């Protein structure tokens, strides 16, 4: 009888553990496209927290601070692995957690619109599931939330319809350091909890590629003053960058930051805008952009103290090499390598400015080039591309690209034939020997 009681207790405890589920938390009122949401939660950790597991998903991108220190810069992947589901980052042994009181802060950027590389959901928010030993902390109604007051969408020309990202404006006079441990969030609202089945997020699917590689803040190759208000900063190559500026100014001065690729492909892409506060200050653009030069348009009475850039990108090593006596071919190799690398991030891309879209006419070239020039991490992006292509099939089983996408569903037959043929799936298989993926897409 005692053994039966023990068994019943164990089963009940397992049922209880199974029913604990991290839901999606959001702002309790309507969230407009291009909004930035702040979330905070204080947790108490009993023992050593160095070994932990964090599962975190967002629509659309997130930044994570633990005890005031930035731990994840631009987490999350554009939606999604198929038309219904959402990617989830799974992070092992996240740094910064300590025994006792800990403050978790999250900033979420909600695209709120469709694009050639992203399918929008109706729910701006975050799902958090943190396990430390036997303790578990989830996104529930105990979290606090606020709309970040500094972010706004500039009034200028909007990015073309292929991009789900909006231009990003930031007003430093309204800045709140909400990630600080001692920040007072008592005036914030309680989050709204939404069950996954009602969110439009579908199932959470593990992120199949590495987190971004952060190369740190670096000096430009050179900076030239082109006029009283225009500074041109030269990058070492076409790169995915977050431009940075340190300056001294009066409050309310408007600074425009964009690259020479702003109209790459002819249509408007993305740019950043910054409104100064009074005094010495720093600003780093939150959204990445690409180009060979960064153009800073700055009022005359603003004193520029420093200009830098942060390159981030797909986490792979430039492992291949080529050299010969002809400098033309050496230069061609270097340019080709940089062209390949800059078209890799959430997906392979046709271009990193106008579309950021996974057209398979480009992917078949890129996946083949990766075998000669990059390490094995690159092939995870190819595998992701293959699975997405097949998991986004229409109801009649035909395939189309680019995917993921929210405002495109047309088939380009020649690209689709290339994807499933010699230069696509077959090249991937011959280079990796990954039978499981091939079996999955050729059932």
List the model feature ranges, each with a label.
Residues 254-256, 363-391, 441-443:
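Carboxylate/His-rich catalytic cores and anion/metal-binding grooves
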Residues 1-23:
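Bacterial Sec-dependent N-terminal signal peptides
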Residues 23-353, 362, 377-383, 399-407, ...:
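Extracellular/oxidizing-compartment recognition motifs
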Residues 325, 355, 410-414, 430, ...:
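Alpha-helix N-cap/helix-initiation motif
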Residues 329, 356-363, 391-403, 409-425:
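Aromatic-lined, polymer-binding surfaces characteristic
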Residues 339-342, 388, 392, 428:
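Structured segments of extracytoplasmic/periplasmic soluble domains
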Residues 244, 290, 369, 385, ...:
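Short, hydrophobic/aromatic alpha-helical segments in well-folded domains
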Residues 365-376, 420-437:
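Well-ordered alpha-helical scaffold segments within catalytic/enzyme domains
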């Amino acid at each position: 009888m005692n053994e039966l009681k023990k068994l019943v207790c164990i089963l009940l405890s397992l049922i209880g553990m199974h029913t604990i589920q991290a839901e999606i938390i959001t702002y309790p009122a309507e969230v407009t496209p291009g909004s930035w949401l702040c979330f905070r939660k204080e947790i108490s950790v009993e023992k050593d927290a160095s070994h932990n597991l964090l599962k975190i998903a967002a629509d659309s991108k997130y930044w994570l601070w633990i005890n005031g220190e930035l731990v994840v810069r631009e987490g999350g992947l554009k939606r999604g692995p198929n038309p219904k589901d959402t990617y989830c980052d799974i992070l092992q042994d996240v740094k910064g957690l300590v025994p006792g009181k800990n403050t978790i802060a999250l900033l979420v950027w909600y695209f709120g619109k469709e694009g050639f590389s992203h399918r929008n959901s109706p729910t701006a928010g975050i799902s958090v599931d943190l396990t430390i030993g036997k303790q578990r902390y989830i996104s529930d109604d105990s979290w606090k939330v606020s709309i970040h007051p500094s972010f706004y969408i500039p009034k200028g020309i909007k990015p073309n319809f292929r991009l789900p990202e909006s231009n990003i404006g930031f007003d430093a006079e309204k800045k709140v350091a909400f990630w600080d441990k001692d920040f007072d969030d008592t005036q914030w609202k309680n989050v709204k909890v939404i069950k996954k089945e009602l969110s439009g997020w579908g199932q959470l699917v593990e992120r199949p590629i590495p987190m971004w590689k952060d190369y740190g803040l670096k000096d430009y190759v050179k900076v030239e003053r082109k006029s009283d208000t225009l500074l041109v900063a030269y990058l070492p190559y076409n790169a995915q960058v977050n431009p940075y500026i340190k300056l001294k100014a009066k409050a309310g001065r408007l600074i425009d930051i964009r690259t020479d690729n702003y109209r790459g492909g002819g249509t408007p892409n993305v740019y950043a805008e910054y409104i100064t506060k009074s005094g010495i200050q720093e600003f780093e653009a939150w959204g990445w952009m690409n180009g060979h030069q960064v153009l800073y348009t700055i009022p005359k009475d603003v004193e520029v103290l420093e200009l830098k850039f942060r390159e981030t990108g797909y986490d792979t090593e430039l492992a291949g090499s080529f050299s010969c006596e002809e400098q033309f071919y050496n230069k061609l190799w270097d340019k080709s390598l940089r062209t390949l690398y800059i078209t890799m991030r959430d997906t392979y891309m046709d271009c990193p400015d106008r579309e950021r879209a996974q057209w398979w006419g480009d992917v078949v070239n890129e996946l083949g080039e990766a075998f000669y020039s990059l390490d094995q991490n690159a092939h995870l992006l190819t595998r992701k591309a293959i699975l997405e292509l097949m998991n986004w099939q229409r109801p009649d089983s035909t395939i189309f690209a680019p995917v993921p996408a929210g405002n495109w569903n047309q088939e380009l037959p020649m690209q689709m034939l290339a994807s499933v043929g010699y230069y696509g799936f077959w090249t991937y298989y011959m280079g990796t020997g990954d039978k499981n993926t091939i079996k999955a897409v050729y059932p």
